[in-house]
Regions:
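Anionic ligand-binding catalytic core segments
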Residues: 1-81, 85-201
Length: 201
């Protein structure tokens, strides 16, 4: 299997946009944090860096929040600090397009979230999260509010992940995955959606 992605860091004239990943922006590196430095942190760290480095941070924050929820629902347990970046276009920085969006649970049993600190080290976890070890919708609602998003926008984003779109099922069933892996992929996503929808007391 080969992973191919279109370069988004090259301008039409062939020049490269300046890019910096969030491991660098939050000061994590192998020399100080060790081999697994890119997993050392929480998503709150990225949110704080977005506010610090991106002038139009509210727009970037909403995109970031969508990515965090997407990665959870679609089983990407490898969404670490180096898989989020900012890029400079003209005089301003913005959140780089999403990349490395894969269902890693097809191959590796790992954590629900790619960073070892989860969503936040300071936010209270829902009783569902505490009891099962898996976040539910309430945890993402709290996280969205904590990073500065409006409640109405949070609800709209979370509602969009409450059902498996027909297009996803169609794409998976028509992919080059084996029949067994197709079933596994869809099972993982459906299980995540059910977990996501659990009510917290």
């Amino acid at each position: 299997m080969v992973y191919i992605t279109k370069r988004f860091d090259i301008a039409k004239d062939g020049s490269k946009y300046l890019m910096e990943d969030f491991a660098s922006l939050v000061g994590k590196n192998e020399a100080e944090q060790g081999t697994f430095f890119k997993y050392d942190g929480c998503f709150e760290d990225i949110a704080c860096a977005i506010k610090r480095f991106i002038p139009a941070w509210m727009i970037a924050m909403e995109r970031f929040f969508k990515l965090v929820v997407f990665n959870y629902i679609y089983g990407n347990g490898d969404d670490h600090l180096k898989n989020f970046s900012i890029m400079r276009i003209g005089e301003h920085y913005q959140l780089a397009p999403a990349y490395d969006l894969m269902n890693t649970c097809l191959h590796i049993e790992g954590d629900d979230l790619g960073l070892n600190g989860g969503l936040s080290l300071t936010l209270e976890k829902s009783d569902v999260y505490e009891r099962t070890g898996h976040p539910c919708r309430l945890d993402f609602e709290r996280f969205g509010e904590y990073i500065g998003l409006k409640k109405k926008r949070i609800e709209m984003i979370l509602d969009s992940f409450s059902l498996l779109p027909d297009e996803v099922e169609h794409l998976v069933n028509n992919s080059f995955l084996t029949e067994k892996m197709k079933r596994t992929y869809l099972r993982i996503v459906k299980e995540r959606i059910q977990r996501f929808k659990r009510k917290s007391e």
